Amino acid sequence: MNSRQMYETIKERLNAHPHWTFHFDAKHDTMRIEDHRTKKGVTISLPGVIAKWHEQKDEAVREIIYYVEETLKTMEETATLSGNERNIYPVIRSTSFPTETKEGVPLLHDDHTAETRIYYALDLGKTYRLIDEQMMEKEKWNRERVKEIARFNVRSLPTPVKEDRVADNVFYFVNTNDGYDASRILNDAFLAEMHTRMEGTMAIAVPHQDVLILADLRNDIGYDVLAQMTMSFFANGRVPITALSFLYENGKLEPIFILGKKRRT
């Protein structure tokens, strides 16, 4: 199954929606589904769907179909910030992610690291909507109000961790699948608490939106394992973020490149 074939498979399943248009981007291996009435839509990274298809077959296709249908259905509805304060969260995206909507409306965002940005989303249950300036102006909200509420809400999310050990290195995973696992990288208190558990160097990875990896690296093997693990998660994620990891030092995140047995370049 290649990207063109997956595009055709998804398109065939969604053809029952007469108002939707489809576009295949061979250069970026993506598919765009858009409602021509609203000019709003979603862009899918096809390699991630294909990787899941190799493991789950038709279940992977059904999952992406459900995601697209729910997302575009929600876009037809009017979403408001007022009254939904508890449903506003920050989301992490790569620096290649657009900073404005297809209509040219700026999305509310902040710099995070050299590899990542922070966007802000209104959770709508089965999907979410990224908050843009037009939405804020309409309700007379300012940027700081959105950010303050979002940061508070992400700190309120539970942070259950699963632990795995490889060659004396310890890896912790946050994987609740609530859509905001990667967002927990913004919970400074949680990161500081995890840092107290570390015996070696603390590293963090957010390969896609549904996982946060925290690593206690005690030898060179740990660096290699983290690099391979992060790349695998990145390739399989529905919303990929970055295949790079970060060192956590003095409350700061610094991207690291791991090549073979070398720790950083």
From Swiss-Prot:
Top-level division of the source organism's lineage: Bacteria
Pfam families: DUF1444
TM region positions: none
Family designation: Belongs to the UPF0354 family.
Annotated protein name in UniProt: UPF0354 protein GTNG_2723
Lineage of producing organism: Bacteria, Bacillati, Bacillota, Bacilli, Bacillales
